[in-house]
């Protein structure tokens, strides 16, 4: 019988090696060699790993460090890694034999009304102690392939953790710059309120002297109070960003304790940055690596379903002691043992194995499609972020000049108004225009930093 098993395994093993070969080509089309909007960026250098340090803002650095250690999204991702590791260990453990240790006592009474017992009642007792073993020899690799699939899923979970970190760092930086932008806008409003109040006092003085109309006074007050009305709304916006920051840090807003406060300011950062080439995204972006590991996991699962078509090789056995009396249980004469190698080959399962293979193939094809979609989205996100950052920098240059010209316009119109050489309407228009473009400039400065953060995130975050 053992010779038959050996010949059967020798016959089937070569066929098992031909099942579910790996190495499918994941990428449908080659990645571009460069970026469409890369002329303002350094494509020869990869992105900085700790990119947030380029802003040289210690408050931002401390916020990111605190969030990376305390955010609930990070803690949840770490638990997912633990869960995935346990699932992988379970799958690996199935490649090993299982052992069971059992001890027991049995007592039975035989009937005295049966001829086989010679119409004599009898009591029988038996003590048992045995170590049993069962092992499925993974001759054709089914268990191994399932273990490999779980390993790939575990590695995908590690990449998902990195993706959470990349997103968290980007969210902290974006929220911080949005907060600083709102603080800068609040400063602009307060500075304009101060300037408008001074101008309003000039108009009132001229009105009292008979040099200005009551309409001029009403218009100056209208501008002043309109600007004042924007301050509470901007303060509420600041509070909203602070509350959002608290959530990212994993604390209550009450525990933020003025960190960050109204002293934060937007850093000036317009230096060319390294973006590398599109091919670097394959190794830098964790979401692409997650998709890649899912493809590999599904490929391994497909291999496992194909190997399920081959026989199972089982080995069971036990060794122990059995005796009618406890005092004789562990004597040599009480020793018992059993070994039973088995080959089990399911030749009909109602289409279960066939459809399991089809399902695994569909899952693999779907994951390959998802991989290519993720890759395409990654390239699009980088291109969009580069274009937005480039445009915002150009916009800042123009807006700075616009603000300078409007400041000069306000100064000149006010001087002419004091001399009675122009109407107050010119001063009024200059005030409104200056406030508008100062707000535009702050928005563009904050927006450029946010676009830069989005670019770093699209490039893989460097975590």
Which role fits each region the language model picked out?
Residues 1-69, 151, 235-283, 325, ...:
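Terminal intrinsically disordered/low-complexity segments used for targeting and assembly
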Residues 25, 197, 226-254, 305, ...:
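Short segments within alpha-helical structural elements
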Residues 26-28, 37-56, 65, 103-132, ...:
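Small/polar, glycine/serine/threonine/aspartate-rich low-complexity segments that form flexible
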Residues 28, 143, 152, 159-277, ...:
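Periplasmic alpha-helical coiled-coil/stalk elements that build and connect Gram-negative outer-membrane
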Residues 60-62, 83, 126-128, 174, ...:
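Transmembrane beta-barrel architecture of outer-membrane proteins
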Residues 75-76, 92-93, 137-165, 215, ...:
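Sec/SRP-type N-terminal targeting helices
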Residues 79, 83-87:
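Membrane-embedded segments
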């Amino acid at each position: 019988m053992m010779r038959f098993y050996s010949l059967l395994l020798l016959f089937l093993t070569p066929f098992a090696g031909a099942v579910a070969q790996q190495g499918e080509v994941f990428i449908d089309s080659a990645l571009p060699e460069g970026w469409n909007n890369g002329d303002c960026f350094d494509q020869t250098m990869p992105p900085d790993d700790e990119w947030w340090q380029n802003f040289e803002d210690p408050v931002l650095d401390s916020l990111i460090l605190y969030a990376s250690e305390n955010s609930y999204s990070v803690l949840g991702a770490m638990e997912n890694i633990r869960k995935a590791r346990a699932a992988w260990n379970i799958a690996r453990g199935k490649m090993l034999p299982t052992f069971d240790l059992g001890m027991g006592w049995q007592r039975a009474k035989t009937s005295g009304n049966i001829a086989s017992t010679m119409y004599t009642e009898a009591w029988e007792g038996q003590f048992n102690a045995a170590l049993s073993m069962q092992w499925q020899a993974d001759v054709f690799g089914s268990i191994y392939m399932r273990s490999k699939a779980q390993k790939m899923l575990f590695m995908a979970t590690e990449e998902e953790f990195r993706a959470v970190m990349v997103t968290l760092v980007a969210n902290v930086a974006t929220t911080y710059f949005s907060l600083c932008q709102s603080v800068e806008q609040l400063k602009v409003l307060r500075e304009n309120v101060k300037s408008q109040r001074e101008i309003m006092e000039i108009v009132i003085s001229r009105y009292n002297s008979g040099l200005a109309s009551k309409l001029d006074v009403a218009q100056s007050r209208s501008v002043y109070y309109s600007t004042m009305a924007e301050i509470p709304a901007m303060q509420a916006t600041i509070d909203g960003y602070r509350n959002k920051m608290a959530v990212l840090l994993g604390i209550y807003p009450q525990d933020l304790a003025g960190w960050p406060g109204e002293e934060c300011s937007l850093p000036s950062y317009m230096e060319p940055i390294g973006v590398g080439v599109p091919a670097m995204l394959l190794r830098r972006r964790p979401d692409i690596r997650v998709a890649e590991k899912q493809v590999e996991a599904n490929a391994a699962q497909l291999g496992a379903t194909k190997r399920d078509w081959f026989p199972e090789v089982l080995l069971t056995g036990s060794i122990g002691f059995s005796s009618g009396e406890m005092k004789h249980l562990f004597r040599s004469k009480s020793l018992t043992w059993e070994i039973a190698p088995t080959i089990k080959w399911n030749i009909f399962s109602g289409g279960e194995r066939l459809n399991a293979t089809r399902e695994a193939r569909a899952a693999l094809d779907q994951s390959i499609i998802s991989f290519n979609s993720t890759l395409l989205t990654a390239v699009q996100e980088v291109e969009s972020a580069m274009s937005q950052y480039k445009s915002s920098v150009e916009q800042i240059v123009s807006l700075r000049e616009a603000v300078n010209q409007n400041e000069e316009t306000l100064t000149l119109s006010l001087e002419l108004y004091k001399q009675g050489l122009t109407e107050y309407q010119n001063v009024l228009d200059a005030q409104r225009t200056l406030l508008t473009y100062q707000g535009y400039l702050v928005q563009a400065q904050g927006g450029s930093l946010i676009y830069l953060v989005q670019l770093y995130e699209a490039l893989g975050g460097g975590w």
